[in-house]
Design a protein with these regions (language model features):
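Catalytic or ion-coupling anion/metal-binding cores of large enzyme and transporter domains
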Residues: 1-298
């Protein structure tokens, strides 16, 4: 417990760009956050001002004669904006499940093919772990969601004229919140990235296409986030080994039976399985084998 507790270095979400932080990014891209609120550190003095601003926005909306419930705000353009933001930042592939459901709740039908077509034309503008070495705090310092959203709007990849919780539409989300004289104000960002190893302009992206590919074959369909996969591992050719459970793979690893090139096929996983099990615990043993030079995939 002590070692586990020591691994958590502060309040808030985990600092890698996983599902929780992808949620934050997409809420910004949908205009459902106070602009710039996504990755402000919990202990930053700006956080309380943003929280107070959120309360003000909620009350102003409720009391307004032009009350805009979420059902009016989330339309096709808003859903597409979120999809583009996910692809432009190399966000979590879990959202290829979540966003299909969210869109359906809004009466909009999307599927993996839509993500794939958008990915082919959406530039990759961010490099945040696991797509790069930076964490979300460094991403925020380099310009964060505001920089990415501004670039995507100016390059024509996002719809700016949508209903948002902040008056002014999505362009307001391309500005940075700052604290001045104990007040919250938003300022324009510099035109250039403050750290091109973390975030880039739409003219000079990390990749011309978003970090996603749709794979199809005689076993079915899958998606892979290639922005997080080194190029020398884009193609793996090896014999398949079939397991009926994650525990079987772990047991085979412990017995030393996996010291070779192979592709692991783990059955009874994924969205249709009971509880939709994830495969996080298989990452360490597979990484050990990769570090030994074996060509391994799952």
């Amino acid at each position: 417990l002590d070692s586990e507790s020591a691994a958590y270095h502060g309040a808030g979400t985990c600092t890698f760009y996983g599902t929780a932080n992808s949620n934050q990014m997409l809420m910004e891209a949908m205009g459902l956050h106070v602009p710039g609120a996504a990755f402000v550190h919990p202990h930053d003095g700006l956080r309380e001002l943003l929280t107070r601003e959120a309360v003000k926005m909620v009350l102003a909306n409720v009391k307004s004669k032009n009350f805009t419930p979420i059902g009016r705000m989330v339309d096709e353009h808003v859903i597409v904006n979120a999809m583009v933001a996910l692809l432009a930042t190399g966000g979590s592939t879990n959202h290829l499940i979540h966003w299909v459901a969210i869109a359906r709740a809004a009466g909009i039908i999307i599927d993996w093919t839509d993500f794939y077509h958008l990915a082919k034309t959406t530039p990759l503008l961010a490099s945040v772990y696991p797509n790069g070495k930076a964490d979300v705090n460094e991403f925020q310092s380099a310009g964060g969601p505001a920089f990415v959203i501004r670039e995507l709007i100016e390059a024509g990849y996002m719809f700016p004229d949508v209903l948002t919780v902040a008056h002014g539409g999505l362009r307001e989300y391309g500005k940075l919140p700052v604290k001045e004289d104990d007040k919250l104000v938003w300022k324009d960002l510099p035109k250039e990235s403050s750290d091109e190893t973390i975030v880039r302009t739409a003219q000079f992206p990390f990749n011309e296409s978003g970090g996603l590919r749709l794979l199809k074959g005689n076993l079915g369909r899958s998606v892979i986030k290639i922005s997080a996969v080194p190029e020398d591992r884009h193609i793996i050719e090896a014999p398949a080994i079939v397991f009926d459970a994650q525990e079987e793979l772990l047991a085979a690893f412990d017995r030393g039976e996996l010291e070779k090139d192979f592709i692991a096929v783990v059955r009874f996983q994924g969205p249709k399985a009971n509880g939709m099990p994830e495969l996080h615990k298989l990452t360490p043993p597979l990484a050990v084998l990769q570090n030994k030079g074996f060509r391994v995939a799952i």
